[in-house]
Amino acid sequence: MIDPKFIGKTYPPTKYIVGIEKIKEYVNATGEKNPLCCNEAAAKAGPYGQIVAPPMFAVVYMKETVGAMLFDRELQLNMPMLVHGEQEFLFHKPVKHGDEVFTTGRLKSAEARKQNLVVSLETESRVNGELVTTGLYTFVVRGGAL
């Protein structure tokens, strides 16, 4: 079980510079078909004037912040017993090639559900101070409430 004093703990900003090659790799790996994400001519003619990252690219620029929480020694999470529960995102603005994305995190909750520990992390990602994506990650530590 996580000591309740850690609920609300914050994780400092991590920086991710969005590269066109990383967007292309993500598009190819996921089979993204949105022309604003994978067709340069369509993207240039579109509302953003260039290729934008697919919304779920958020997992790429948020991963270091999520990792900081998962591997936080103070929380003493039992990693071999941890599984991904779910994730939710709110997309506020598109992320584009060249953007410097800064993501922060906050341990939202840690609660016992039967014998398991359910841990939630909230994230906020910003470009030039403007919120682009918020996320909620939920993890389950099997047997972690015992």
Predicted regions and their residues:
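Low-complexity, intrinsically disordered segments exposed to solvent
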Residues: 84, 88-90
